[in-house]
């Protein structure tokens, strides 16, 4: 029984190419719809895509036609209503055919919006388009688990799917020439002798018959040699080479002190969920370190970071000190691209804010690729914000700070912080 194996890239989804072309064409409409969806839905609600609506006027194909207005002379075959010289009244413009709410119209026509669904993968692709971790430059072989397959010559053994047909046939041809060389030489001599006998001694049937038998014997010997032997088989040799990979670590520092209201904590968690989703989708080799802090800081796992209800006073420097210790112990700056994202409401013990600036400027900023700080407050900024502004003046390319007032600000601020930079 024969089996047909479908190895096409699209498989059964024959319209995949057309769908991708459609998504590229209406990219701006889809991006706008995705941004609106992110602002109104929960960041954790990513199990499905989004329903996209495109106005009917935007999906019309451009066509060449006569413009409205002007004078035209047209012959209508079989016209019984009008005669030459009469004026045909101009058709009225459309009025009541649009899709939407409003009063009914008695004339005109319109077109409903085109609505379609994008998948979860497509939703995330548009959501994180043009975003990246800045300054991801350090690449090392240490601990690399990524490899690339490269050609490494020809081998005598290997997988049948990697057989080199040209080299195999060349080897078989060389073997046949080498093993049949003497027989072919004798065959040529016998053929010459037969030709001579047929011309000079045509009646010498005995010698002619003997030479013919010798020729047949030599041909049989040559033909017994197999056209292809296992010795001839040659295979493309492929080897895996370690591929230098960018190792990165992201420190997530979240304030869970008593001054953070439940609404403020929810905004902070949504920001970090969006960041975590972005990292895990776009980067294969990246580690995330979660740090919660109030008067003291602790490294926690993902579950505790997002769902623990522990709270207390506010000493922001405790989180920065812990981050510096973890960097020194596990993530040397010579091998790792180090990033950090900090979220707080800005409330801090007054004497602690200068300490935070000192730790950042001397122990952290010289070793990180990028540090972001988001302050979640509708009020005026406090001392911590102004201390961090001084950090931004000293490190304008690797430090950024933004303010969040409501949940609707999360996605725009996130895009602002991680917008892809043009190479300089």
Curated annotation (Swiss-Prot):
This is UPF0229 protein PputGB1_0427. Residues 81-107 are annotated as: Disordered. Residues 92-107 have a biased composition (Gly residues). Belongs to the UPF0229 family. PANTHER family: UPF0229 PROTEIN YEAH. InterPro entries: UPF0229, vWFA_dom_sf.
